[in-house]
Amino acid sequence: MAEAFTSFTFTNLHIPSSYNHSPKQNSGPNHGYWLSKNVNEKRERNLMRGSLCVRKALPHDLPLMAVMVQQIEGMRDIITEKHVWHLSDKAIKNVYMFYIMFTCWGCLYFGSAKDPFYDSEEYRGDGGDGTGYWVYETQEDIEEKARAELWREELIEEIEQKVGGLRELEEAVTK
């Protein structure tokens, strides 16, 4: 069995900046002596000013090196393979976009899938429909039954009082 591990390192990290480069020289038919030294100096100052403010996220020549090291059982030799990848800003953007889209797809797909726990008797044993509103509906049903029972008891007491009052009147009339 071969054991392997992989490491990623940044090698020869050189971040280019615009003030290291000289400004572009125009060599067209209209380019002549009239383009004075002051204009070139102004252009150089603008390039330096922009270099202090504007930076790209990653330079185009950022090498990412993958080192694969394998050690074979019973052997003392180590086999090393090096691969260098240069990732551009567009490639990094594509990787992140793929990750975001894959994550959104996973959330939508697995969010809409059936869940055996919520469909089980353990969860719906009390009569729930999975929405959560059944708790309030059940509570309202219990309260409605309790009110109906209370009204029934009050009505029975009121009828008994009236019947008792009528009996007293009948007894008073008969005496």
From Swiss-Prot:
Disulfide bond annotation, renumbered to this chain: none
Transit peptide (residue range): 1-24
Keyword Protein biosynthesis: no
GO biological process: photosynthetic electron transport in photosystem I
Mutant phenotype after disruption: Malfunction of the NDH complex.
Subcellular location: Plastid, Chloroplast thylakoid membrane
Keywords: Chloroplast, Membrane, Plastid, Thylakoid, Transit peptide, Transmembrane, Transmembrane helix, Transport
Lipid bilayer topology: Single-pass membrane protein
Gene Ontology CC: one annotated term: chloroplast thylakoid membrane
Regions crossing the membrane: 95-111
Entry keyword Cell inner membrane: no
Subunit structure: Part of the chloroplast NDH complex, composed of a mixture of chloroplast and nucleus encoded subunits. Component of the NDH subcomplex B, at least composed of PnsB1, PnsB2, PnsB3, PnsB4 and PnsB5.
Main function: NDH shuttles electrons from NAD(P)H:plastoquinone, via FMN and iron-sulfur (Fe-S) centers, to quinones in the photosynthetic chain and possibly in a chloroplast respiratory chain. The immediate electron acceptor for the enzyme in this species is believed to be plastoquinone. Couples the redox reaction to proton translocation, and thus conserves the redox energy in a proton gradient.
Cited PANTHER family: PHOTOSYNTHETIC NDH SUBUNIT OF SUBCOMPLEX B 4, CHLOROPLASTIC (PTHR36315:SF2)
Stated name of the protein: Photosynthetic NDH subunit of subcomplex B 4, chloroplastic
Organism: Arabidopsis thaliana
